[in-house]
C-alpha cells in the first residue's frame, strides 16, 4: 500500500497507549470528528478511510458527515447499531435468513456486549486485576471468531498491551458510549467497499450484499475464503490488496 498511498493509522481513544477522555459520549461521531480534524491538519483535503468493528462505525459516520472529503470507505464488519432498519415484509429470503442466524449468534455470543454496554467499569476492575482473567476474556474471542490460530507471541503481545496500559476498561466504554449516546444510521452515498470473510459468515450468517446496499453505496464486494472478525490482523495481505485495488480505482 505504501507504494501507492500515504497511510495514516490513528488509534481509537481508550485502546493501548491512546488514552480515553474522562467523560461520557465518546461515540462514533466524537471520534470521527477528531479523525477528520487530524487529516485536515496533516494537509489532506480528500482521503479514504477504512475500519472494522468500532473502526467501521467511526468510518461510516466520517463518510456520512464529510462526504466532500472522504472519497471512499472500506469496511470488513457491519456494526449492529448502524444496521439498516427494514420492515420484515421488505426483506428478501436471503436477508431474512441472515438476520435469523444473526439473532441466534446474539443469543450465544453477545453476552460480552450486554455487560460492556451497561457495566463496563465493574468487569473492568476484575480484568485489570487478573492477567489470567484478561487473557481468558480476550483470548476466547480469538478462538470463537477466527479460523486462524494466532501465534503465542501475538496473543501474549495483545494481552500485554491491554495489561500494561490498563486499557481493557477504557476500551469497553465504547460499548457504553455508543449505546447511550447513539448515532442514528443514515444512507452513506460515499463509494463503499466491503470485505466478507468466510469464518464470520459461518457463525453470524451469510451477509447479503442487498442488505448492506440499504445503508451504503456498495461499489466493491469481495468474498474471502479465510479469515473472520479480526480480518485485518488475520489476513493483512488480503485486506491490504483489497484496499489498494478499491482506492486506486477511485482515482
Q: Over which residues does each language-model region extend?
A:
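The feature captures the conserved acid-bearing segment of alpha/beta-hydrolase catalytic domains
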Residues: 88-120, 184-187, 213
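Alpha/beta-hydrolase active-site loop signature
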Residues: 13-16, 80, 228
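Glycine-rich "HGGG/HGxG" loop immediately N-terminal to the catalytic nucleophile
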Residues: 12-26, 60
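C-terminal subdomain of alpha/beta-hydrolase-fold enzymes, centered on the catalytic histidine
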Residues: 116-251
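Conserved HGGG/HGGXW glycine-rich cap/lid loop of the alpha/beta-hydrolase fold
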Residues: 1-17, 247
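Alpha/beta-hydrolase active-site loop
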Residues: 25-41
Amino acid at each position: 500500500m505504501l507504494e501507492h498511498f500515504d497511510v495514516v493509522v490513528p488509534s481509537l481513544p481508550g485502546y493501548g497507549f491512546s488514552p480515553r477522555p474522562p467523560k461520557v459520549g465518546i461515540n462514533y461521531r466524537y471520534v470521527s470528528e477528531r479523525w477528520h480534524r487530524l487529516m485536515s491538519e496533516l494537509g489532506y483535503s480528500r482521503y479514504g478511510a477504512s475500519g472494522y468493528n468500532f473502526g467501521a462505525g467511526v468510518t461510516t459516520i466520517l463518510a456520512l458527515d464529510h462526504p466532500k472529503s472522504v472519497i471512499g470507505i472500506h469496511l470488513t464488519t457491519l456494526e449492529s447499531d448502524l444496521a439498516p432498519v427494514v420492515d420484515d415484509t421488505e426483506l428478501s429470503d436471503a436477508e431474512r435468513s441472515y438476520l435469523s442466524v444473526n439473532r441466534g449468534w446474539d443469543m450465544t455470543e453477545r453476552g460480552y456486549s450486554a455487560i460492556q454496554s451497561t457495566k463496563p467499569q465493574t468487569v473492568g476492575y476484575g480484568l485489570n486485576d487478573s492477567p489470567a482473567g484478561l487473557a481468558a476474556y480476550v483470548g476466547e474471542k480469538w478462538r470463537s471468531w477466527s479460523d486462524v490460530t494466532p501465534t503465542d507471541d501475538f496473543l501474549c503481545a495483545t494481552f500485554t498491551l491491554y495489561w500494561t496500559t490498563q486499557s481493557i476498561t477504557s476500551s469497553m466504554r465504547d460499548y457504553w458510549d455508543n449505546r447511550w449516546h447513539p448515532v442514528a444510521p443514515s444512507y452513506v452515498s460515499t463509494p463503499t467497499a466491503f470485505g466478507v470473510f468466510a469464518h464470520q459468515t459461518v457463525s453470524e450468517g451469510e451477509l447479503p450484499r442487498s442488505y448492506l446496499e440499504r445503508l451504503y453505496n456498495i461499489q466493491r464486494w469481495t468474498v474471502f475464503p479465510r479469515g473472520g472478525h479480526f480480518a485485518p490482523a488475520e489476513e493483512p495481505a488480503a485486506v491490504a490488496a483489497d484496499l489498494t485495488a478499491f482506492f486506486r480505482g477511485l482515482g
